[in-house]
Amino acid sequence: MSDRFIEAVQSLDLSRVPSPCHLIHRGLLEENCRILHSVQERTGAKILLALKGFAQFSEFPLIARYLSGTTASGLHEALLGHEFFPGECHVYSPAFPPADVPELVRFVDHISFNSPSQWQRFRSTVAASGRKISCGIRVNPQYAEVEHEIYNPCAAGSRLGTIRSEISGPEALEGLEGLHMHTMCEQGADVLARTIPHFEEKFAEFIPQMKWINFGGGHWITQPGYDVDLLCSTILAFRKKWGKHLQIYLEPGEAIALRTGILVCTVLDIVRNGMPIAILDTSASAHMPDTLEMPYRPEILGAGKSGEFAHTYRLAGGTCLAGDVIGDYSFPQPLVPGTRLALLDMSHYTMVKNTTFNGICLPAIASFEPATGEYRVIRRFGYADYKNKLG
């Protein structure tokens, strides 16, 4: 983790918020947004917030000062963006339910269809809306450098995007104004630079008839060490080659919220079975499912690897899932019931994926404003939230 992030988190008072709680540092969030805005200024590209990664709409007014709009994965995300985030509203889905499209065309600005057949099916609905909606198609260049197959949109047999052999010719894309590719996950500008030639090799004949190209998400633009200069030069070179009339879009989700917040949790009990096990009021399964899906071991403020410090514990969640385990950590001081912990970098792909498995309470949502020192609890969850999603 970057020194800037650690210093900011160390200054937080964990006792000022409920437990468990997602706590967003608004100063860090704004720093990320400024980096993204600088890319827009240097390249003319437009950067959209991908709501699938971060959708805490209480922070949309801040983010909207810097970004050009939102991109959604379906009707409900699109509605959230339309309601709370000024700017462009984009939507893509692997397959749109027929009932959703008449709703979407009432307010979205861009629709990316996954296949020519989806475009042909809903083309008349778009036209009947009477609104200017720019439509495109997601394509699959069949090239990616994603390490984890579960996150690889170009894996063999992927449903995400149309491969070149499934497009009969330019006439199949008649009426479409954009090409959308998403091939990356937590990667640098060098990967985009290596991917674009594969995109051009397969889809160059269609580019001249387009008004925009969307390079998708997975761009780790706010990660320390990310080569922003290379990203900008890559975008500018593409526009120089294919025409400055082409609007370029990027739609990161993680890059907006990367290293902006923590998950505050509390030790409930310590049990022993071969080693001390600290049971927390949070859950890997319900509150941070990527730790099990990827899997990965989240960092914790002040903690080290097993055996690094004097006191080693296995940290586990409070659900009945035997594998609801966060990992093994060591601490300079013993943990006791009531000890509060800060799991680092827990803003993205957490709130949007939380569940109430076992009836476990969803973490509260709070923010910290460094300019004033204010802690604001935005939302607490309870029994009604659990009950209402079940009937």
Which residues fall in each region the model found?
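N-terminal capping/small domains of soluble enzymes
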Residues: I6-P86, Y92-F96, S283, F331-L344, ...
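Active-site-proximal beta-alpha core segment in soluble small-molecule metabolic enzymes
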Residues: A45-W212, Y226, K241
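Feature marks short, surface-exposed loop/turn motifs that line or immediately flank catalytic pockets
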Residues: Y143-E145, C185, I221, I256, ...
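Glycine-rich beta-strand-to-loop/alpha-helix junction loops that act as flexible
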Residues: T183-M184, I213-T222, P252-A255
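Short glycine/threonine-rich loop-to-helix capping motif typified by GTGT followed
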Residues: G188-R194, T222-C232, L258-D269, D328-F331
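Acidic/histidine-enriched ion/cofactor-binding microenvironments in catalytic or ligand-binding pockets
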Residues: E201, I207-M210, L230-A237, K241-G243, ...
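Charged (often Lys/Glu-rich) extended helix/loop segments that serve as interaction or gating elements
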Residues: Q247-G391
